[in-house]
């Protein structure tokens, strides 16, 4: 579960390395926590030099992995090793051209198929 002030890894090659969540906007209803597939507003805390994204820039991101376990529709419980997000633009397209690490199958059901197609493994 991701809430404001949570630090996340960036799972794409957009140039950012670490994000800090500042607002949960894509959760169902008026929830305080973001889960896999939810959209957040975050600030970049660490970035690669000479890349388009810079430190302290405010961006949108979608959660692709969380340490908090979740139960899939088929009853399987999945927990990842880190909290990770993929940076997206206003239309929901990923800014990077690659996604690192596994992503959840539930992203496909949430119409985030571009992120799923870039991922090397879908669980």
Curated annotation (Swiss-Prot):
Top-level taxon: Eukaryota
PROSITE patterns named in the record: RIBOSOMAL_L14
Coiled-coil stretches: none
Record keywords: Chloroplast, Plastid, Ribonucleoprotein, Ribosomal protein, RNA-binding, rRNA-binding
Keyword Translocase set for record: no
InterPro entries: Ribosomal_uL14, Ribosomal_uL14_bac-type, Ribosomal_uL14_CS, Ribosomal_uL14_sf
Tagged with keyword Membrane: no
Subcellular location(s) of the protein: Plastid, Chloroplast
Gene Ontology BP term (one): translation
Major site of localization recorded for this protein: plastid
Recorded GO CC terms: chloroplast ribosome; cytosolic large ribosomal subunit
Annotated PANTHER family: 50S/60S RIBOSOMAL PROTEIN L14/L23, LARGE RIBOSOMAL SUBUNIT PROTEIN UL14M
Protein name: Large ribosomal subunit protein uL14c
Organism (species): Zea mays (Maize)
